[in-house]
Amino acid sequence: MVMKLFDSELNIMEILWRDGDTAAKKIAEITKEKIGWSKTTTYTIIKRCLDKGAIERQEPNFVCRALVTREQVQEHETAELINKMYDGAPDRLIASLLGQKRLSAEEINRLKRLIESLE
């Protein structure tokens, strides 16, 4: 089961998904540069991810490893959105998304292929 991850936790996960196993010290450097977080803030968020089972800590050097994939989190978040905002109806989500903008021919073809693959 994939757990609910908050935006701050997703910032940590994005680093791990992009870079693979990463030392907590390096994660703190990245978040300081990109987000402006202090080292303490970063370590607090890393601890939350550890407590939730989203990452594991490896020694030496406090190396963090993602235990859930980006795809698992995306699927979980999408299911939550569909249930919360669209009464569990994925077609209502798709209709809402499609109503937001005009699709290119390439986007329409990709959607057609996706639908055909589900049939």
Tell me the role of every PLM-derived stretch.
Residues 53:
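Glycine-centered, phosphate/nucleic-acid-interacting loop/turn motifs that mediate DNA/RNA or nucleotide
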Residues 10-15:
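Pre-recognition alpha-helix immediately N-terminal to the DNA-recognition helix
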Residues 22-31:
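Short acidic, hydrophobic short linear motifs in intrinsically disordered regions
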Residues 57, 66, 105:
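Short beta-strand "wing" residues that participate in macromolecule-binding interfaces
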Residues 5-8, 60-78:
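Short, cationic-aromatic polyanion-contact patches
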